[in-house]
A protein has these predicted regions:
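Non-catalytic cell-wall polysaccharide-engagement segments
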Residues: 2-3, 7-19, 27-28, 102-203
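Conserved short loop/turn motifs at secondary-structure junctions
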Residues: 23
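Secreted/periplasmic proteins that engage bacterial cell-wall peptidoglycan
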Residues: 30-107, 123-126, 188-228
Length: 228
């Protein structure tokens, strides 16, 4: 038996991420909290951590993980929202459009909840989006972050702008690291954010944080600097 232990330890390195929920992840912002809801649901459905990160990467590219967002920051219009033939007016985390948008709104009404509710949208994503829910449950079982991100983009999101794939994969890798290292420590280490310039360092001019592309990352996160 003792001889088998090193062998078992070796093979364990190649086993995919387990599907148990991580309950000790620190989340300090609405975006992080939304990400945690999606992450936990993927694992509950038997998906992998890689699959959860891949879905988050796609969702962030679509909506910045803001459940209330409407495409192009448009305002809500009931007539337009309930028109199944109208495209380019996408709603929510996955930017559901046309018939899928109407299905989301009808589901929200049936539950007597706002369509902007994160938990409602995640439930719709996995249980109420017809064959796309079945497809998503399979896709999130992927074990490679980059490939699973691409599979979700092409097969489930069916994104028009496929040139956004590298950005989606970057987001996915960020969330994989964030969720598997305990989240936001809030101490300036790991994924945390520190508002201060380190002791002994100075800036020769103020940093202008406006107009940068990575608005979905909080200023002074390491990923903000990477993207900018």
């Amino acid at each position: 038996l003792l001889l088998l232990l090193p062998i078992l330890a070796f093979f364990s390195l190649f086993v995919g991420s387990n599907s148990s929920s991580d309950t000790d992840i620190n989340t300090n912002t609405p975006q992080q909290q939304t990400a945690k809801v999606i992450w936990d649901r993927v694992l509950k459905e038997g998906g992998t951590k890689e699959g959860a990160a891949a879905l988050l990467g796609n969702n962030q590219a679509e909506s910045e993980l803001q459940p209330s967002i409407i495409q192009s920051n448009a305002t809500y219009n009931e007539a337009k929202a309930m028109d199944t033939t109208l495209g380019g007016y996408a709603f929510g985390l996955a930017q559901w459009d046309s018939g899928r948008r109407v299905n989301l709104l009808n589901y929200a009404k049936s539950q007597k909840k706002s369509w902007t509710d994160t938990n409602l949208q995640v439930e719709f994503m996995f249980e109420q989006d017809g064959t796309d829910s079945t497809l998503l449950k399979q896709l999130v079982k992927g074990t490679n972050v980059k490939q699973t991100t691409e599979d979700i983009m092409r097969k489930w999101e069916r994104a028009g702008a496929v040139d956004s794939l590298p950005k989606r994969q970057g987001f996915a890798e960020y969330w994989y690291t964030f969720m598997t290292t305990g989240g936001d420590s809030g101490t300036g280490g790991g994924s945390g954010i520190t508002p201060d310039i380190p002791s002994g360092w100075t800036l020769d001019k103020p940093i202008n944080t406006s107009g940068y592309i990575a608005s979905s990352y909080e200023y002074k996160q390491c990923t903000w600097f990477t993207w900018n």
